[in-house]
């Protein structure tokens, strides 16, 4: 794991990554936070997504959530990422990777996919695009 992250930092031209007190490595690329957390035999990549339009008071906007989940199902064969709601109800883009099968190039590819999916998802969560998608305009 340490060699993998050391090689990733080198290939990205960065200083070696240092985990926080919870063991999470935080990497910011193109203003997006990618958190890397070792979890047993896996490396979990998580990116919280600011999605205030997903909430309707104390409830979740089911129409928008359904649309997002349908997209996640559609990309499931090509990408290891999925959408999850964390314990606080925040939308998170997550990938679980088997450390045993992971090399630096593979990790970079997954991070690039994570960023590409974020660029696809975030515009859908702006007030204008949400209103037009669910008929609020």
Curated annotation (Swiss-Prot):
<comment type="function">
    <text>Functions as a specific chaperone for YopN. It could facilitate the secretion and the subsequent translocation of YopN.</text>
</comment>
<dbReference type="GO" id="GO:0030254">
    <property type="term" value="P:protein secretion by the type III secretion system"/>
</dbReference>
<keyword id="KW-0472">Membrane</keyword>
<dbReference type="GO" id="GO:0005737">
    <property type="term" value="C:cytoplasm"/>
</dbReference>
<protein>
    <recommendedName>
        <fullName>Chaperone protein YscB</fullName>
    </recommendedName>
</protein>
<keyword id="KW-0963">Cytoplasm</keyword>
<dbReference type="InterPro" id="IPR013353">
    <property type="entry name" value="T3SS_YscB"/>
</dbReference>
<keyword id="KW-0143">Chaperone</keyword>
<keyword id="KW-1003">Cell membrane</keyword>
<dbReference type="Pfam" id="PF05932">
    <property type="entry name" value="CesT"/>
</dbReference>
<keyword id="KW-0614">Plasmid</keyword>
<dbReference type="InterPro" id="IPR010261">
    <property type="entry name" value="Tir_chaperone"/>
</dbReference>
<dbReference type="GO" id="GO:0005886">
    <property type="term" value="C:plasma membrane"/>
</dbReference>
<keyword id="KW-0997">Cell inner membrane</keyword>
<comment type="subunit">
    <text>Interacts with SycN to form a complex which specifically binds to YopN.</text>
</comment>
């Amino acid at each position: 794991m340490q060699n993998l992250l050391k090689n990733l930092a080198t290939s990205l031209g960065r200083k070696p990554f240092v985990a926080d007190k919870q063991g999470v490595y935080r990497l910011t690329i193109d203003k997006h936070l990618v958190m890397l957390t070792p979890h047993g035999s896996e490396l979990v990549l998580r990116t919280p997504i600011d999605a205030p339009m997903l909430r309707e008071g104390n409830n979740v906007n089911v129409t928008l959530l359904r649309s997002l989940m349908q997209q996640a199902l559609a990309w499931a064969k090509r990408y290891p990422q999925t959408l999850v709601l964390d314990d606080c109800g925040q939308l998170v883009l997550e990938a679980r990777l088997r450390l045993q099968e992971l090399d630096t190039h593979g990790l970079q590819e997954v991070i690039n996919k994570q960023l590409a999916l974020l660029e696809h998802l975030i515009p859908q969560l702006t007030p204008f695009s949400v209103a037009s998608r669910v008929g609020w305009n």
